[in-house]
């Protein structure tokens, strides 16, 4: 399996937080993904880029916060995340990068 350049557009970055680290013990990895990416696209991108077998993909959209900037109210962008469950025995080390 080879990675297609469009797969790099689907996966934006890994999420490295305390919650994401706790999920890694359950064989799950969290990524920030493109807002228009679908579950099948995310599954294919992870399988091709990291050469692992994906069991399932769950997605969520975190709404952007309202912030003040120079007295004006602004809105941060929404962020889409994907929680990717890997098959047994499969691992991804997200700290090394692509």
From Swiss-Prot:
UniProt keyword list: Ribonucleoprotein, Ribosomal protein, RNA-binding, rRNA-binding
Record carries keyword Ribonucleoprotein: yes
GO molecular function, one term: rRNA binding
GO BP, one annotated term: translation
Organism: Methylobacterium sp. (strain 4-46)
Domain of life: Bacteria
Span of the signal peptide: none
InterPro entries linked: Nucleotide-bd_a/b_plait_sf, Ribosomal_uL23-like, Ribosomal_uL23/eL15/eS24_sf, Ribosomal_uL23_CS
GO cellular component: ribonucleoprotein complex; ribosome
Function, as annotated: One of the early assembly proteins it binds 23S rRNA. One of the proteins that surrounds the polypeptide exit tunnel on the outside of the ribosome. Forms the main docking site for trigger factor binding to the ribosome.
Keyword Ribosomal protein: yes
Matches recorded under Pfam families: Ribosomal_L23
Family membership: Belongs to the universal ribosomal protein uL23 family.
The protein's name: Large ribosomal subunit protein uL23
Subunit structure comment from the entry: Part of the 50S ribosomal subunit. Contacts protein L29, and trigger factor when it is bound to the ribosome.
Organism taxonomic ancestry: Bacteria, Pseudomonadati, Pseudomonadota, Alphaproteobacteria, Hyphomicrobiales
Gene3D superfamilies reported for this sequence: 3.30.70.330
